[in-house]
Each structure stands twice: as C-alpha cells, then as structure tokens.
UniProtKB/Swiss-Prot annotation:
It comes from Fusobacterium nucleatum subsp. nucleatum (strain ATCC 25586 / DSM 15643 / BCRC 10681 / CIP 101130 / JCM 8532 / KCTC 2640 / LMG 13131 / VPI 4355). Its EC number is 6.3.3.3. Catalyzes a mechanistically unusual reaction, the ATP-dependent insertion of CO2 between the N7 and N8 nitrogen atoms of 7,8-diaminopelargonic acid (DAPA, also called 7,8-diammoniononanoate) to form a ureido ring. The active site is at 37. This is ATP-dependent dethiobiotin synthetase BioD.
Length: 219
C-alpha cells in the first residue's frame, strides 16, 4: 500500500467525521500514522487544562493516552472556530498550524488531518477557511457523508465544490449505515452521479475497519 497524508472533512456537522477519523486512525496507526486536529472548539477543562473532545474521544477509543501534540488550538466555545477565537480573544495564526503539521511529519510517516465541519467553515473571519487549509497542506480529501434522507444533495454539493476548488478527492466514506432500503438507494445514486469508485461504508456501531478494506481504499 502506498499511503499518503489526507484531510478528513464532512458534508455536515454531525455526519460522524470524528468517528470515521478514529476508525481510520485505529487501522492506520500501525503504519506510523498520526492524527492531527489543527483547531478544536467546544473544548472542556480536565485536570486544569483545555481538552479537545475529538482528541479525547479518539485516544480513549483507540486505548492510548491523551496526546497534546494532536491539536494546535483549543477553544472553549462550542461554535465555529472563527467565532470561538473572537469570543475568547485568541488569534488564530495559520503559520503556527503549518509549523505544527510540519513538525508532526518529521516524526511520523503520514498524517491524518481532521478538519472542523465542512469546506466553508471559517477559521479566521473573512480571511481563511477549511478549504484554504486543505490547499495550504496540498492534501487529498476523504469526504465523510451520511446515508439518510438529504445525503444525496449534501454529498453532491460538497463534491462539486471540491471539483470547483481544484481539491483532489481520495474517496468517500458513507457513515452510520443502518441497512435501510433508502440508504442503499442514496449510496447508489451518489456513486452513479459522481462516478466515484473508491469508497467505504461504515455500519452503525462498527468498531473497526478491516485490513482488506483499508488495502482497497488506499491502494
């Protein structure tokens, strides 16, 4: 398998981007992958310091210690990063994010970067968005999408935006699949419209991605 760094984004806020990132990291950790969350809002105090909930979830799920090196900016307010940073008087410096990413690359073979929501989430008001960060890192995207009603529209809009922006798609991950007939049709329609061949389906409650699936997805 020829691994490379990649950037995980979602079609919507609650599509399960962190859960999918966690399953991917769990499967790829043995290949010296590292997880990186550049900016996390909605953080909570634990042992006197702000803790990133996504990092906390991932490390507990995988069974490793919480790792401060997995996140650059931790913000308390549970709102978009640009607004949380304004409310808390914290200036987001993209150069710090870039430097952190480059430092991680020196220690690990590959990096799995998890964004904050979708492509148009602002990191710095009117200046810098998630899609800018993807372009800065020059990474292909793993797009996490749902399977429920509305998934076709959300997924196709994001795919079209990626194409317009010139951002490469590595593959799709259909998350939280429950085996309903309309989910099967939603997946079928998205794949037919997009002509995408590289995808994963994560079932509701799935705890791991098999080596066979990983090999196929990253081959």
């Amino acid at each position: 398998m020829k691994f490379k760094d990649f950037f995980v984004i979602g079609t919507d806020t609650d599509v399960g981007k962190t859960y999918v990132s966690t399953l991917l990291y769990k499967a790829l950790k043995k290949y010296n992958f590292q997880y990186y969350k550049p900016i996390q809002s909605g953080c909570f105090l634990k042992d006197g310091k702000l803790t990133a909930p996504d990092v906390d979830f991932l490390t507990k799920f995988v069974g490793i210690d919480y790792d401060d090196s997995m996140v650059t900016y931790t913000l308390k307010e549970e709102v978009s990063p640009h607004l949380a940073s304004e409310m808390e008087g914290i200036r987001i410096e993209i150069e710090n994010v870039k430097r952190h990413y480059e430092d991680l690359k020196k220690k690990h073979s590959n990096i799995l970067v998890e964004g904050a929501g979708g492509l148009y989430v602002p990191l710095i008001r009117d200046i810098f968005y998630i899609y800018d960060l993807i372009k800065l890192f020059n990474l292909p995207v793993v797009l996490v999408c749902g399977t429920k009603v509305g998934a076709i529209n959300h997924t196709m809009l994001t795919l079209n935006a990626l194409d317009t922006m010139g951002i490469k798609l590595h593959g799709l991950v259909f998350n939280n699949y429950r085996g309903q007939f309309f989910e099967d049709d939603n997946i079928k329609v998205v794949l037919a419209l997009s002509k995408i061949k590289n995808y994963l389906i994560i079932k509701n409650g799935q705890k791991e991605i098999s080596d066979k699936e990983i090999e196929k997805f990253f081959n």
